[in-house]
Amino acid sequence: MTIFNSISSISNPTRTALSSINTYNYNGSSVNDNSTAYFDNDFGGWGGLGDFGNGNGCGGGSSNVNVINLDIDFGRRRHRRCC
């Protein structure tokens, strides 16, 4: 099983951190996704790091919160589309 990890270090104590550990099946391969997202209290940015099984992380730096999709789905094959 290939494990993809992403680590986000948050230095600002005023940020709220959301973290999730998600194991799912991606194109027949088992993937463990550890991702962290955070939201600034000044509403200036929503960021995150994560690999979704294809080697490409999504998110980080966009000030439009409408494009962020936090979708946690356990035990299903799924295709993620982001950005």
Curated annotation (Swiss-Prot):
Family stated for the protein in its record = Belongs to the UPF0512 family.
Name this protein carries in UniProt: UPF0512 protein I
> Which species is this UniProt entry from?
Dictyostelium discoideum
Q: What is the lineage of its organism?
A: Eukaryota, Amoebozoa, Evosea, Eumycetozoa, Dictyostelia
